[in-house]
Amino acid sequence: GFRDVLKGAAKAFVKTVAGHIANI
């Protein structure tokens, strides 16, 4: 459903942000 898509996008976003922070 729409909520699952939102959850997936949020997870991917957090993963990306965490990756950027880890690279610094």
Swiss-Prot record:
Protein's UniProt keywords contain Acyltransferase: no
GO terms, biological process: defense response to Gram-negative bacterium
Location(s), subcellular: Secreted
Tissue expression summary: Expressed by the skin glands.
Keyword Secreted listed: yes
Keywords: Amphibian defense peptide, Antibiotic, Antimicrobial, Secreted
GO cellular component, as recorded: extracellular region
Family of the protein in this entry: Belongs to the ascaphin family.
Purpose: Antimicrobial peptide that shows higher potency against Gram-negative bacteria than against Gram-positive bacteria. Has a very week hemolytic activity.
Name this polypeptide is given: Ascaphin-3
Originating organism: Ascaphus truei
